[in-house]
Amino acid sequence: SAEFIYENIMIQTNLINEAYLNGVKKFVFLGSVCIYPKFAPTPVKEDSLMTDHLEPTNDAYAVAKISGIKMLQAYHKQYGFKSTCLMPSNIYGPNDNFHPENGHVIPSMITKFNNQTEEVTFWGDGSPMREFIHTDDFADACIFSVDKSSDNGELYNVGSGENVSIKD
């Protein structure tokens, strides 16, 4: 919706601008792999950005995140503002959404197995491929990126590096 895009763009615009105005040494922008085209080959590479159509169910969120990436790259070019952009794969860990019907993949599977009586039912045929990363590993990647990544708003995918099917 228009409100969703507006609010997300305004939030990140204000954060980025205030970080720049207040002398933040390096800004770490967190996005999502939903910024990539719907049919991007997996594992998705950073250079797939804006090469095809987005997934329609996520396009408002993706557009907002892409605008943040582009804004940081422009701030670096114009002002020398240092930033990096991290796109996590499917994050899982404590305090996630464990609801069996609308939770994230791994937490909802845990709930279903825990509550199982005879049979566990999943969505679809289990063939979709996903890459996962634990919250602790993603936090480590964020800290690592402050010192070790480029400063020009470059985009980095963060995940396990291995796609697995849901049924596996």
Q: Where do the model's predicted regions map?
A:
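Short-chain dehydrogenase/reductase
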Residues: I5-I9, H53, T57-I69, H99-P107, ...
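Conserved Rossmann-fold NAD(P)-dependent oxidoreductase catalytic core, especially the SDR/UDP-sugar
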Residues: Y6, M10-D59, T84
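Hydrophobic positions on the long internal alpha-helix
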Residues: I11, L15-A19, M71-L72, A141, ...
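Active-site Tyr-X1-5-Lys
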Residues: N17, E55-S89, S108-T117
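Active-site loop of short-chain dehydrogenase/reductase
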Residues: G23-F27, G80-K82, T117-E119, D125, ...
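Active-site beta-alpha turn of Rossmann-fold NAD(P)-dependent dehydrogenases/reductases
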Residues: V28-S32, M87-S89, G126, G159
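Flexible, glycine-rich beta-alpha linker
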Residues: I35-P37, D59-A60, T84-P107, P128-M129
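Glycine/proline-rich active-site loop of Rossmann-fold NAD(P)-dependent oxidoreductases
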Residues: A40, I66, I91-P107, N115-E118, ...
